[in-house]
Amino acid sequence: MDQEMTTVASPDIRVKATSPDSNRAVLEQSIVLSDSGRLDEGSSIRGGELERDSQEVGRETVREPLMCHDLDIHALAQRGDTAAIAAMLQENPSLNLSARDAQDVTPLHWAAINAHMGTCRLLIDSGADIDAIGGELKATPLQWAARNGHLYVVHLLISRGADPNIHDSQGFNTLHLITHSSAVMPLLYMLHQPVAIDEKDTDGHTALMWAAYQGDALSVDLLIRHGASVNSTDNAGMTPLHWAAVKGNKVSIMHLVEAGASLDAKEEAGKTPRDMAEELRGLVPFQKGLEEAGWSIDGVKMEGKLGPRNTILAIFLLPIAVLWLIFSTFKWLPVYVGVPFAIAEFMGMQYTVVLVLLGHIKAQDKVSTSNYFASIITASLIWVGYCWISRFAVNTPGYAFSNLGFIIMFVGCCWTFWTAIVTDPGFVPKGQQDAEIKEVLEDLVDAGRLNGTNFCIVCMARKPLRSKHCRTCNRCVARFDHHCPWIWNCVGAKNHRSFLLFVLFLIGGIILFIRLTIAYIQQNAPEYIPTPNPGLTTCDISTTLCQAGDFDPFLLCMALWSTLQLTWTSVLAISHLWQVSRQMTTFEVSNLGRYGFMGGRGGQSLRDQSGAMLKQAAAVGAGIGMSGAGEEAAGPPGAEAGPEGNALLPPPGGHVHGPQCRHGDHARGHSHGVLHICGALWKTLTGPLMTILGLDRFTKGKALGGMKRAGRDQNPFDMGMVKNCIDFWLPDNDVDYMTVYEIPPGGWRAYRRKLAMDKRVPGGKGRYEVVSEQEV
């Protein structure tokens, strides 16, 4: 049954009740006053909120001044005309700020639902009833703001004493309504307020049930990690897993099952979650969710036969044996027979790892998260070392310097490879205590900066500049570069140098290994004599390769295998050396190509993003004063980012790209011509190879475009090539990237000078401070 809130005055907000399936209040339509004071029924509304021009995001909308008598206080509050309300109060100090309009709604309700921070603050400071219950749903201003996910309005109201535990006529409290909004950051904030996480509405639904029904996997995960019950039941006996099965969201199902949700729970009609999924034709996502959680469709826990530790050991040993088998195959069989056998042996290794050793893991990235690729590098190093000891050490006279150089490169490669694997890449510490997390949240909300750019909802920690949440490691990494399966670790602030040294040592070692291989063959191999009958010739390639293959096929295969690694490692080394010289990471270069700025979605550059953050903080009223701005400063409701992403803010230039844009035919769609088909086919064939070799970061997206755009104006950390290289190769531990949260007003150079000064002066603080330009 639809319920409506109407008013004799023009503002009209309609609310209707829906799922599951009869009692969720959602915003249907809003008629707002235009800048001219007339009613606009065709205005673009999202979540009950007038879509403002992107230039207006983060500040009060500028409107033509109106006389107080032109509109009543309710219409002014809905407009967010703080100045007019202030003038009205000055003219009539006894004005009733809790007066009701025809819908039984107060001005604070209208200001809250439209996210007018300045108006809300003025009304509260002037004595408006903060917990006034109004409208047909008998809700408070806090509940109206929560329904639309207005984080900063919710924070303002709660900080001024609003009660989040009041229920409206449908039995919803503030936590239920924020869950309805699907906005993650407001939900996170509310979970650290004095609310009962398992409070039920009139029909017995908890916030977790609502999140599961909506398919909001982030909200489901957040509620579970804050202690929500996964086995509570509503009035119909349905659990959160039942509602997740109704929606068919596999990620929500996975989170619930991992948290211990019962697969055998039955609702009042005797149906389990699986029964409901099958009845609603959602068995496929339900099964995938179970598999990714480590369960079979029959409710049996899937576990590896060897156990985690033995599985790692088996994956480590398997490439050692298989590489020996592949290289020895060419010793036992002719080339034309050995090649198919070698391919079959390699594919057999792949099959064993993926389907046998890791067969119980259904995650798509299970191979890249395992030690498989690192084991291939380890096996290669073992057999290269074996070849040097058994062949080059005593059988290459006259190449002492090459042998010495190879030993240095080999030892350096092994050492840096090991350190890159075991070194903490710069994992940002996770939040542990609720009080500590709440303090960080309150600080960020007060500053108007609680969003995915600054806080990770998975790690429950504030995110430093240049950091990123790695989905593979499931941790935030300071000065994140990329996740490298070849070192079984992320590359970040603390192990980036070890990683690059490993690559450089590897390249140098391969070059010297190839040189020593050629010298060994030339000095020790007998003269190659082809078969006398041309029809029986077994080697039609160069005489040198035929001679090497006939003399020592194992060594030749090892040299060719090493040469293959030389290709991608050379590209990797060149790109990283270039990035080091520009004080950039692979992730930042990729962002430049995709978004036009380094730090992800949020501004044209890190410099611009920081400026935008300061403007946003001022706009949402973080400072002292009556003026404020709408919630739009933090992005529209529900636009909060996940753990590996940033808030979707409109670009500073004011233009928002969409279907209405006309930037040429290429901007409107894609081509299905021959070139497009060939390009797609090429990507399909080479994509997996590029991923395995680690070259995908240079080919996917617009990474190459990012390299072209990597100018100094877009990089506030660039101190010049020489200083950048010194900073990378000779670190003095001045900069702790795990605690740098913003660019100082004086710039990065000023910050570095201040750190150096503090280090030289006895008693210097030696830590991050905001530095003014006058101090340097």
Curated annotation (Swiss-Prot):
Keyword hit for rRNA processing: no
List the transmembrane segments.
312-332, 337-357, 369-389, 403-423, 499-519, 554-574
Spell out the SMART domains in the cross-references: ANK
Q: Which residues lie on this side of the membrane: Lumenal?
A: 333-336, 390-402, 520-553
Name the chemical reaction catalysed here.
L-cysteinyl-[protein] + hexadecanoyl-CoA = S-hexadecanoyl-L-cysteinyl-[protein] + CoA
Report each ANK repeat as a residue range. 68-97, 103-132, 137-166, 170-199, 203-232, 236-265
Q: How does it sit in the membrane?
A: Multi-pass membrane protein
- In this entry, the parts of the chain located on the Cytoplasmic side of the membrane are 1-311, 358-368, 424-498, 575-776
Which chain positions lie within coiled-coil regions? none
Q: Which GO terms describe its molecular function?
A: protein-cysteine S-palmitoyltransferase activity
Extract the InterPro entries matched here.
Ankyrin_rpt, Ankyrin_rpt-contain_sf, Palmitoyltrfase_DHHC
Q: Which GO terms describe its cellular component?
A: early endosome membrane; Golgi membrane
Cellular compartments annotated: Early endosome membrane; Golgi apparatus membrane
Query: Known EC number(s)?
Result: 2.3.1.225
Region: Disordered; residue ranges are 38-58, 628-665
List of catalytic residues? 484 (s-palmitoyl cysteine intermediate)
Keyword field: Acyltransferase, ANK repeat, Endosome, Golgi apparatus, Lipoprotein, Membrane, Palmitate, Repeat, Transferase, Transmembrane, Transmembrane helix
- Record note on domains: The DHHC domain is required for palmitoyltransferase activity.
Q: Which family does it belong to?
A: Belongs to the DHHC palmitoyltransferase family. AKR/ZDHHC17 subfamily.
Reported function: Palmitoyltransferase specific for casein kinase 1.
PANTHER family from the UniProt entry:
ANK_REP_REGION DOMAIN-CONTAINING PROTEIN-RELATED, PALMITOYLTRANSFERASE HIP14
Q: What protein name does the entry list?
A: Palmitoyltransferase AKR1
What species was this sequence derived from?
Answer: Cryptococcus neoformans var. neoformans serotype D (strain JEC21 / ATCC MYA-565) (Filobasidiella neoformans)
Question: Which gene name does the record give?
Answer: AKR1
